[in-house]
Amino acid sequence: MPRHSRAKRAPRPSANNSKSPNDDDTAFRSPEPEDGTDYGLEFTTSQLTLQDNNRRSSTLRRDAGRRQPAARDSSTSGEEEDQENRYPTTRSPQTRRMTVQQESKTRAAGPVAAQNQTRRRKAANPMSRAKRMDREIRRLQHHPGTLIPKLPFSRLVREFIVKYSDDEPLRVTEGALLAMQESCEMYLTQRLADSYMLTKHRNRVTLEVRDMALMAYICDRGRQF
């Protein structure tokens, strides 16, 4: 085997030679075995261990080289997260300026929007409540048709006919029904107008039941005389 030929045994030191061997000479030499069966295996195993150590160190260097960019990326991401999670007082001057400018813009836009809203509201309701009520009254006064719907009034007439007729129910023509409806509307409008005069006399605007009751009492007293 080639290992047997390459391996050399260390010579025995003589009694006359008192010089100590060098470290380099003893590092690659195995001690003298007792039975003489060592074929330089220690030398070969030491070489193998050295090679293994070199391989491990090389792989560690490569792993370290690969881990460095990953560590940098993680550190940069961590710094970004820290910047995002920081309290607003610890921000940079540039970010402070940006936030101040944005706040000033929103504050300036707030009063303008409020003014626009108020203007729109004023333009939408320029007429007061009293004027709107007077306009509605004039519109109803100039209305040519009947104010009470025809179908509800006909039901009311039928109810009174059934209630006060003893024998067979009466029949009403369309013209008679229209005349009754117009006369009823005239009576109601005149009575409400008289009642509203009492409301104005009491310096009020809303018509109440007591005003209509007082006007009915006055009308009844006038009929007796």
Curated annotation (Swiss-Prot):
Provenance organism: Drosophila melanogaster (Fruit fly)
Subunit organization = Forms a nucleosome-like histone octamer containing two molecules each of H2A, H2B, cid and H4 assembled in one cid-H4 heterotetramer and two H2A-H2B heterodimers. The cid-H4 heterotetramer is more compact and structurally more rigid than corresponding H3-H4 heterotetramers. Interacts with the condensin subunit Cap-G. Interacts with Chrac-14.
Pfam short name (any one): Histone
Family statement: Belongs to the histone H3 family.
**Gene name per UniProt:** cid
Principal place where this protein is found?
nucleus
Q: Which UniProt keywords apply?
A: Centromere, Chromosome, DNA-binding, Kinetochore, Nucleosome core, Nucleus, Phosphoprotein
Give the protein's function.
Answer: Histone H3-like variant which exclusively replaces conventional H3 in the nucleosome core of centromeric chromatin at the inner plate of the kinetochore. Required for recruitment and assembly of kinetochore proteins, mitotic progression and chromosome segregation. May serve as an epigenetic mark that propagates centromere identity through replication and cell division.
According to the UniProt entry, which residues carry Phosphoserine? 74-75, 77
Q: Supply the name of the protein.
A: Histone H3-like centromeric protein cid
A GO CC annotation given for this chain: kinetochore
- Gene3D superfamilies tied to this protein: Histone, subunit A
Where is this chain compositionally biased, Basic residues type?
Answer: 1-11
